């Protein structure tokens, strides 16, 4: 059921991330549920956008967790994770990213209980794509966003700054 996702993950396996990605592949292989569209309350797909403007990476302030994260969101039914990353980047920052992207990482993220939405704790398999910023005027952003240099970024995202000149 999740062969398309598994094949994408296999393309980014390195010695550095092999153990983590094998665990995610096994999770996808054992899942009998559609993971797009929030159908499965325990395990869902999300996608994040890594977009640089010069040496700075875009971050948003998450509306519930109140922390700086990459622009991201749930993968909708019949949507690819890449399309989600592009859509969410635009919605959350108002900026546009080119319809191209390179998968650079996949993570299993524990999402805490959300009292506001009465959403139980669950996990996301998060596909992280490097996207290129389009040179056009931004529209209205849904969320506060920040352009941060390496030294200002949350620790877990600092490893992505190696992609800034690709």
From Swiss-Prot:
Mg(2+) binds at residues 88, 92. A motif (Nudix box) lies at residues 73-94. Residues 42-166 form the Nudix hydrolase domain. Its EC number is 3.6.1.-. Keywords: Folate biosynthesis, Hydrolase, Magnesium, Metal-binding, One-carbon metabolism. Belongs to the Nudix hydrolase family. Probably mediates the removal of pyrophosphate from dihydroneopterin triphosphate (DHNTP), a possible step in the pterin branch of the folate synthesis pathway. This is Probable DHNTP pyrophosphohydrolase. It comes from Lactococcus lactis subsp. cremoris (strain NZ9000).
């Amino acid at each position: 059921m999740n062969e398309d996702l598994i094949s994408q993950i296999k393309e980014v396996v390195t010695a550095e991330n092999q153990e983590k990605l094998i665990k995610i592949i096994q999770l996808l292989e054992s899942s009998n549920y559609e993971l797009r569209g929030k159908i499965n309350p325990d395990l869902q797909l999300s996608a994040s956008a890594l977009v640089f403007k010069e040496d700075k990476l875009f971050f948003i302030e998450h509306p519930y967790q109140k922390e700086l994260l990459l622009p991201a969101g749930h993968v909708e039914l019949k949507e690819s994770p890449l399309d989600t990353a592009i859509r969410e980047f635009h919605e959350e920052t108002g900026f546009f990213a080119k319809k191209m992207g390179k998968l650079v990482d996949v993570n299993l993220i524990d999402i805490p209980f959300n009292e506001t939405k009465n959403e139980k704790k669950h996990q996301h398999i998060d596909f992280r794509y490097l996207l290129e910023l389009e040179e056009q005027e931004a529209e209205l952003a849904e969320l506060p966003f920040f352009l941060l240099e390496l030294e200002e970024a949350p620790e877990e995202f600092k490893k992505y700054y190696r992609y800034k000149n690709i």
